[in-house]
Amino acid sequence: MSRVCQVTGKRPMVGNNRSHAKNATRRRFLPNLQNHRFWLETEKRFVQLRVSTKGMRIIDKKGIEVVVAELRARGEKV
């Protein structure tokens, strides 16, 4: 399972760790992904999405029905 948010599309990015001596070593910054079940009232069932916490805020703002409709329009299976 890839580390990609289904709502926002956030994915891991790369950068550097910096020590006190300013030595750079490569590292990955991972998105804060959560597996979360959302209740779809129109379909009377739960859908499980892998979303970042930013994605959860978007769902709170727009509503799960709108977000699921956008996912289906993009061709994602929900």
From Swiss-Prot:
Tell me one GO biological process term.
Answer: translation
- Return the annotated region ranges for Disordered: 1-21
Q: Specify one Pfam family.
A: Ribosomal_L28
Q: Which GO MF terms does the UniProt record name?
A: structural constituent of ribosome
Tell me which UniProt keywords the record has, alphabetically.
Ribonucleoprotein, Ribosomal protein
Q: Name one GO cellular component term.
A: cytosolic large ribosomal subunit
Tell me the domain of life: Bacteria
What the record says about family reads: Belongs to the bacterial ribosomal protein bL28 family.
**Protein name, UniProt field:** Large ribosomal subunit protein bL28
Species per Swiss-Prot/TrEMBL record: Shewanella amazonensis (strain ATCC BAA-1098 / SB2B)
